[in-house]
Amino acid sequence: SWVRLRDRRSGREFRVLSLHLDHISHEARLAQVRAVEEETSQYPAGVPQVLAGDFNSRPSNPVAGVLVGAGWVDAFVEANGEDAEHMSFHRFEGDAYKPKKGTPGRIDYIFLKGTGIRVVSSAFVKDCVGGKYPSDHYFLTADIVIE
């Protein structure tokens, strides 16, 4: 899904895109992210773009690398440093969740691309009410500026 928006004060247009990549097939995720990159690359650099969602891939996976290689900036890493590795999926268990195999990792992202767009901060929100989480993922936020 995507939407093209216009800032009322500046008149500047920008795009916000949301996705949820396949959770089973690595090949499907690669094909999906390549299709998204192909579509988004049709817009000039002067149109800032924000791409957010569940990529079902850790930062070291080639799926994220497709976007980084095409000039997208990982907002969380930009705001928190290259070594920022956090778990974003938790199966409604919060910090008590321990994966059966491997180590926990971040699979949710906010990417930025274009001139005049930058991240100010990015963090995971771990809200729960009465021990119940509204999602099996922590919410990822980013404060961005479009100049």
Question: What do the predicted segments below correspond to?
Answer:
Residues 1-13, 21, 120-124:
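Structured beta-strand-rich core segments of catalytic domains in phosphoester-bond hydrolases
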Residues 19-21, 54-55, 138:
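Active-site metal-binding loops of divalent metal-dependent hydrolases
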Residues 24:
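A short, histidine- and acid-enriched strand-loop-helix "catalytic/donor-clamping" loop
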Residues 4, 27, 31, 41-49, ...:
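Metal-dependent phosphoester-hydrolase catalytic domains
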Residues 16, 49-51:
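Hydrophobic/aromatic residues located in beta-strands of well-ordered beta-sheets
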Residues 15-19, 142:
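Short, well-ordered beta-strand elements
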